Structure formats: C-alpha cells, structure tokens
Amino acid sequence: MKHKKKNRLVVAISVALIPYIGVTGDIPDSFRDLWGEQDEFYEVKLYGQTLGIHRIKTTPTHIKFYSPESILDKINLKKEKEKELSVFFTNSFSRNGNMSCQGNTTIQYNCNYIKTKSVDVIVDDVDNVVNLFIGNEFLDSEAHNDEYHQLSRNVKKAFIQSQTINLSDSGKYKRLSISGNSALGITDTSYAVLNWWMNYNKSNGYSNNEKTINSLYFRHDLDKRYYYQFGRMDRTDLSQSISGSFNFNLLPLPDIDGIRTGTTQSYIKNTDKFIASPVTVMLTNFSRVEAFRNDQLLGVWYLDSGVNELDTARLPYGSYDLKLKIFENTQLVREEIIPFNKGRSSIGDMQWDIFVQGGNIVNDNDRYIEKQNNHKSSINTGLRLPITKNISVQQGVSVIDNKSYYEGSLKWNSGILSGSLNSEFSFLWGDNAKGNYQSISYTDGFSLSFYHNDKRVDNCGRNYNAGWSGCYESYSASLSIPLLGWTSTLGYSDTYSESVYKSHILSEYGFYNQNIYKGRTQRWQLTSSTSLKWMDYNFMPAIGIYNSEQRQLTDKGGYISVTITRASRENSLNTGYSYNYSRGNYSSNELFVDGYMTSTNNGDYHEAGMRFNKNRHNAEGRLSGRINNRFGDLNGSFSMNKNRNTNSTNHSLTGGYNSSFALTSDGFYWGGSTAGLTKLAGGIIKVKSNDTKKNLVKVTGTLYGDYSLGSNDNAFIPVPALTPASLIIEDNNYGDNNISILAPTNNDMFMLPGNVYPVEIETKVSVSYIGRGFDPNGTPLSGAHVLNEPHVILDEDGGFSFEYTGNEKTLFLLKGRTIYTCQLGKNKVHKGIVFVGDVICDINSTSSLPDEFVKNPRVQDLLAKNDKG
C-alpha cells in the first residue's frame, strides 16, 4: 500500500515527542492535536501474508484494531482457540516501530519479526503495514504446513469462461473454430468444469459443422491429496498435476461419461513445468503452418526455411495426433501427422499417484465406436511410482469392451557430465495392437534429440478399441552444434504409414493396390547460420541443403540466404535475399522485406507488421496486426499471392481472438486473454477515486502484461487455478498529480477453478501545496491549524506543506479564535507540487467556512477547543 509521505512525517514527529512520552502534560501545545488518537488505514500482514486493508486507531506509541473480527475471519485458527484470541484483539498494542525494517528491501537481521505466545505487532510506517504475529498455539497447524499450498480465504464463487476464436480462409479452403473453457465455483472444495468447441469447415464447395463437449463434470477435492469427479471427461486433466500428471503416449484412454477418482498434485509446493514431445518441421521456403487436433484449429505459425521447432506452449495438454498443414504462397503443399504428448513434469515429486475411471465411451468421430448407436464401456487405471528423484515408472491399464491394453513407461531425467539428459521409454501390449515409444534429448552446449513412435494393429486394419487404424511408425532426430560462430542443425525424419482405409492416410500418400494404402516420406535437412553485428545492423547469412523422398517423388536441393535486420526496442526492419536450387523444381531466387512496429500505452499492446516477397514465379504480400489489452488478445493477417505464369491471384486470411469474463453475485466483469489456461480463476479489481482520470492504477503480474485502470473501472484478471499467482498494485503517477493508493500492494492467491479474489482499490489524486501564510500585517501565522487537511500546523515562519485532495482553491486557517482565508491563486502545478509563495491571508468569520468544513467533526472539535481557550 502506498501512502508514505504523511507517515514519514508521523515518524519524525513521534521521534521528536519521545522525550515527552509518559509526561503528557509537557507536550508542546502545537503538537497536542497530533498526540491524540487518529484513524488511519494500514495493510495488515500475518507472517508476511496480506490480510487486506483495515482501519486502525493509532497514537505515536500504540495501535488498536477498529474491527478485529474482520481480521480474524481471514486467519486459519483452531476452533477451540478463536474466543480466547478474540479477547487479545480487543487490546491496544505497542507499535514496536524500532523493530521494523521501515521499508528497507535489503535483508536486515531480525527486523519485522517477534516471537510471541499471544499477539504482537510491528508497525512499519514507511510502507503503511502492520505486521501481525500470533502464537503458534492459536493457529491451525495446516496454516503453517510447508508441504502444501493453502487456498486463499478471501475469495468469492463465480462463473468464469474463456473463449477462443481461430479462423483460416484460403479461398476454396475455409475453417472457423470456436472453443470455450468454463469453471463454476460451488463449495470451498468443489467446482464444475465445461470445455467445448465448434467447427465450421468448407472445402471445394463441401461444408460441414461440428459441435463437441469434451468435458462437463463436477469435482470435489479431499484433504489436498485425493479427488473424485463425475460427468463427461476427456484425458486432458490426466496429463496435468490436477489429476496426478499421467503422460501416456500409447494407452487408449477414450472420453467417457462416468466417474474418476485418484490422487492430485495440485497443492504440492514444487516446480511445475510442462514437458512435451518435440514438433519438428523442416521447411525449404517461408511457410504458413496450421496445427489441428481432429478438426479443431489450434494455432498458426509463420516460419522461415530451415529446421523449425514449433512452440508447444501454445498447444493444449494431452496425448493426441497433431496434424500439420503446410502452405507456401497460400497453397497447401503437404500435410504431416505427428503423435504429440504434452503434460506436467512429475519427476522428483517423490510421491506415488494413482487414478481409476470408468464409464460409457463417448462417440469421438467414430474413433472408438463403429456406429453412432453403439454403446461401449471402458475402465482405465494408472499408477506412477518414483524410484529416485530422477527416475519414475508409470503403468496403465485400459479395458475397453472387454479388450485389455497395458502401457508401461520409464522416465529418466538426470545430469550427465556437464549436460542435461531427458528421456522416456514406453511400450504398449494389447488385444490386436502393440506399440513402443522413445524420446531422448541431451543438451551440453549442443543439442541432440531422438524421437521414435511405432503403433500397429493387426493386419494394419482398424481397431476401434485401441482407438486407431493402420500401422504407423515415425523417426525423427536433430543435432544442433555451435562451431566457430556458426550454428549448424541437422534434422532427419522418416514416416511410414499403412492402412486398408484410404481416408486414414494423408493426402501425400497414394493408392498402393486393391486392398492396401501405403505411404512413406523421408526427409533430411542441414542448415547453418550465423549472426554478425555492425553498428545497428545484424547480418544473418544461412546456407542449407535438403533431400525429400515421397512415394516416387524425390526432391533434392539447397539454398543460401542473407538477412539484414535493424531493430530497436519497438521497431524492426528486415530485408533479405535467398537462392533455392531444387533438382525437381529447378532454381529460384527470392527477395523479401518485412518489418513490424510495436507500442505499449497504459497497458495496451499494439503490433503491426508487413512482409513482401517476390521470386520469378510469384509475388506475395502479407499484413499482420495484434492488439492485446484487458479486453482480450486480437490478432490477424492477410496475404495476397499473384502467380505471374497463370496471372492468377490467391488470398489467405487468418485471425484469432481470446478473452474471458467472470459472473459473480455482484456483477459481470470482462477480462483479457487467458493465454491457453484450461482451469480458470482470477482477480476482480474495482477502482474508486476522488477524481475522474483514467490510468490511475497499474496492475502487474497478469498473464499478458500490465493492466491500466482508471476511476470507477472494473476488470476481471484471469490467473491459473491451483497455481500460486500474485497481482501487484502500483500507482500510475503521471503528469501534474500525486496518486495515493489504499490497497494491498501484493495480492498473493491460490484458488480453485471458479473462484475470484476481490481487490478493492481506493485512489486519491492530490497536489502538494508549499508556501508561507501571513496575516494582513505581514506577521507569520505560526502555529495556525490548516482546516483543509488534518494534522497540518504552520511553522514558526508561517511555512506550510501539505497534500490536498479537494478542489477548494482557498486555504482556511485557524489561529487562536481567528479564522483566516488565504487565496492560493492560479500557480502552475509541476510534478504534483504547487509553489504558492508568500500568501497574505484575510481575517474572516466562521460563516465563511464551506459546509463540508462546518460539518467536519475534526474542524468542529478544533473550533470548540479554541473557543474554550
């Protein structure tokens, strides 16, 4: 909480009054007003954890809580000790200011700490914080449990939803995907979740619409270790800590309408990071890559030629086939399917985890069920056991329509020599199906990775119980080595697929004979690049060779390119030239220019970009833009390509939007991007102010950046559920005003899905007046009380300095029984300060006081005391 100037004054005055403590009769008359009890607002912290802003009665030596029950409600206490502790809170407490760190951020020995068996406080007047200390016998032992996160107490139940829209339009090929994630808080330990998506597809005059509910279930957590849930469920949660971090690569786990129970890692205090199988794309030209799960568009990437790794942070959790569509010059040139697995890391958790689920299988595009009206049941279970802190084994069993499948896996993450090794080995055995999976990566100044996935059903037909058809095997490997200032990367992939169903083979695979469809693609690519800097320019030459064999088609070639970049903090301009030789497609050269501009203004992020490239056959231009703020993340691009040989023109349009909202018992609040979150919680920010200005408050710690809020603004700020999060409130001081904030500076939270953490912020916009006051005879009005603001007394030469939040331009003084009015004039405000100089004040009467002054108890008390005097 920020309101420091006044408190520094109080500290100084308190120090000045130390010689008079205990001898109140010797207190100078000019300080008696400050010595009395005052009402202040302080942030209260219990062992460093904020309990919010509370009204405190203060004197220079003691404090007293105005409303102890509002503080006790936010503390985990032993039930049998609540009454005894409430008695302590009715007492006054010594300030213990000498034990405060006084806002010092550097570590000091034993400051801001008292060991107590009852209740004690340390008042930090610099940061406006009351540090509260309570004896351990009063606190619930769970509140000090370092093993588990504690759920935030000051929360409200809400309905929270995020919505994502992705579209892609390439003329004859159109796709629109809309998806949503919802969470509803029900009790302190339970909630409901909904996940859905809709697709609209149109290609060559054929169109279809799809609607799917992936998840709709009720969940209840037990003792921070166990859970049960029932409803419709997919396998996404199983890959995350919320359901034990089970990452199965091969085991069939269908969507079910049923029940699941098991252990959870959500509350454990450990480093939570995602692990994902690599998605390597080898490109020979600048390309657009679209990623799909089933028919749902997950994201779009624009990538340069070379061996590229997709950013898997943008992809959802789970184990599924990732379909990649690769476009060059707005034309679809090939498709790839990559088995993908993404989950939370469980290595080193040093606890066992288990789950069991059962129910009726949901028809997932005929994946597990032959006909729409067929009904099958499924029972699945999994167990993971850590062997050491670096090794764990995982086992899973699925029984689908009385057919059994088993997957066993071992994960080993370790430091070897001076590098890091991450590996996973799995195998599957089951009814008419088998498979194996290996993933190994090693980094030690260089990077080496290997990936292999092999899945087969008998006779390469269709196994509805296993959930896949045909036989599929893929290898990929990459090696990246820095040498003599150059980085060289060698990538290799080999994919083989065989099926009796043509519809289950990608478009690049063709007819083999009357009964079998086969396809094989082998690719390797070697690239080498470096970066040279000269003044503000970066020169990036690159060279590469490649080989691609697909059915009876072979393409071999190479390319060389150079890119020149000039970049600043907010702008970038690139230009480059590339020459590509292909034995199959002859040679081509290409010139491109691209650039982008970004700006951030009061929490709003704006980005605009353009690219133009031209070769012997095609010319293409692309415009892109992005806006990200507290109302959502909107991005889009438009490309136009002209073929000089056919004189035809093609276009491509892509776009995306993500936002969120929360509905609570006291209102509707719109929010920004959820950045791919699947379990939603958030903060509700409400701003009140004595001013109408915008951009008074800055909120940091959000998913996309900073929020900037003004007077009477409300906002929902999404944060990940069951993950520690923090929202930091800061004043947005600018221009010619001071901004003071009455709110906790750091708001730490840990919440279930469907819960919101309310933060009410009161801001005061003020200016500081500095000058001297004189009576009509030119005599300094020393000792006069300023009626406009409390606790301000003119010094010996009539000097005054105070912050004022009102609009009144007249200074009202009281000296003895005389009221003076001083016109502050129209002096300019500079950085929140008005220097009024020497002011001649007129003698006036009580009738000259504004009504707000006359009705003010503080002013009434001063007038009464002076009348008696």
Curated annotation (Swiss-Prot):
It is found in: Fimbrium; Cell outer membrane. Keywords: Cell outer membrane, Fimbrium, Membrane, Plasmid, Signal. It comes from the Bacteria. Residues 1-22 form the signal peptide. InterPro entries: Pilus_assem_C, Pilus_assem_E-set-like_dom, Usher_TcfC. One of its GO terms (cellular component) is pilus. Its main location: other. May serve as anchor for the fimbriae in the outer membrane. This is CFA/I fimbrial subunit C. The gene is cfaC.
